[in-house]
Amino acid sequence: MATRRLTDAFLLLRNNSIQNRQLLAEQVSSHITSSPLHSRSIAAELDELADDRMALVSGISLDPEAAIGVTKRPPPKWVDGVDEIQYDVGRIKQKMKELASLHDKHLNRPTLDDSSEEEHAIEITTQEITQLFHRCQRAVQALPSRARACSEQEGRLLGNVVASLAQALQELSTSFRHAQSGYLKRMKNREERSQHFFDTSVPLMDDGDDNTLYHRGFTEDQLVLVEQNTLMVEEREREIRQIVQSISDLNEIFRDLGAMIVEQGTVLDRIDYNVEQSCIKTEDGLKQLHKAEQYQKKNRKMLVILILFVIIIVLIVVLVGVKSR
C-alpha cells in the first residue's frame, strides 16, 4: 500500500496559519477602532470567511479561516501526541547517528588498548534508543484513545497519521536493527582475527605449572598479555549479549508495528469493501426505483380506465332512467 508522508506539510501549514491569524487579528482590531460604525459588517465578513470551502477555494493570502478557527474549532487533542512522537523520532535519528559514530570509533581504534568509556557510552546510547522506541510505540498505540469524540473526517485523518507514524517507526527500527546486526558481525570478525593472531597450541595451565610454561618460551609480559586478552574476550562477549538483547527488543517492537500497519490496512480494506457494497446497494435501489416508477405508470392507466368505466356505467343508468320516464 503506497502512502505519502504529509506530516511536514501539515506542520508548515499550521505554523503559517498561526502567523496569519495574528496578522489578521491585528488588522481587524485596528480597523474596528478606526471605524466602529462598520463593526457589524466586518463581523459578517469574518463569519462568511469562516467556511472551510471558501477559505480553500478563494485565493485569500491572510487565511481568515484560521483567525476565528481557534475560537470555534480548536485543534484535536491528538495533535499534541503527534508532535511528541515526531520529536521522539527526531531524537531517535540523532541518537542513531551518535551510535554509528561510536561504533566506528570503537571498532577502528589504531591501538589495542581497551576503552571502557566508549563501551559504556555505546551501552547507554543503545538503551536510550530502545527506550525511545518503546515510548513511541506506546504513544502511537494510545493515539486512537484521544479521538473518541471526533468527527468522521478527523477519525480518517487520525487513522492515516497513525499508519504513517507506524510505518516511519518501522523503518527506523529496521535500520537500527541492521546497524546493530552489522556491529555484531564486525565484532565477531574482529574477535576471530584476534583469536587467529593470539591463539597458541600450548594449553593453559594452573599456577603450579607456570615455571614449565615459562621454560617453554613465554615471558611474564606475554602471560600478562594473555590474561588481558582473556579479559578482553569476556568483555566482548558481554557486549555481544547486550547487542543480541537489544536486537530481540527491536524484533518485538517491529512485530507490534507490523501488526499495527496490518490492522490499519485491514481497516482501509474494510472501508473499500463498505464503499463497494454501498455502490452495489445504490445500483439495486436505482433498479427498484425504476420498477416502482413503471408500476406507478401502470397504476395510473388502470385508474384512468376505472374512472372511465364508472362514468360509462353512470351514463348508462342515467340513459335508462330518462327513457323509462
From Swiss-Prot:
Annotated compartments: Golgi apparatus membrane
Phosphoserine found at: 41
t-SNARE coiled-coil homology domain location: 230-292
Keyword Transmembrane found: yes
Cellular-component GO terms for this entry: cytoplasm; cytosol; endomembrane system; focal adhesion; Golgi apparatus; Golgi cisterna; Golgi membrane; intracellular membrane-bounded organelle
Transmembrane segments: 302-322
Disease: Pseudohypoparathyroidism 1B: A disorder characterized by end-organ resistance to parathyroid hormone, hypocalcemia and hyperphosphatemia. Patients affected with PHP1B lack developmental defects characteristic of Albright hereditary osteodystrophy, and typically show no other endocrine abnormalities besides resistance to PTH.
One GO BP annotation of this record: endocytic recycling
Expression by tissue: Ubiquitous.
Vesicular side: 323-325
Species the sequence originates in: Homo sapiens (Human)
PANTHER family documented for this protein: SYNTAXIN, SYNTAXIN-16
One Gene Ontology term of the molecular function aspect: SNAP receptor activity
Residue intervals on the Cytoplasmic side: 1-301
Protein's name according to its UniProt entry: Syntaxin-16
Xref: Gene3D superfamilies: 1.20.58.70
SUBUNIT field: Interacts with GCC2. Interacts with BAIAP3; this interaction is increased in the presence of calcium.
Any Pfam family matching the protein: SNARE
Entry membrane topology: Single-pass type IV membrane protein
SUPFAM superfamilies: t-snare proteins (SSF47661)
Record function comment: SNARE involved in vesicular transport from the late endosomes to the trans-Golgi network.
Family stated for the protein in its record: Belongs to the syntaxin family.
Entries under InterPro entries matching the protein: SNARE (IPR010989), Syntaxin (IPR045242), Syntaxin/epimorphin_CS (IPR006012), T_SNARE_dom (IPR000727)
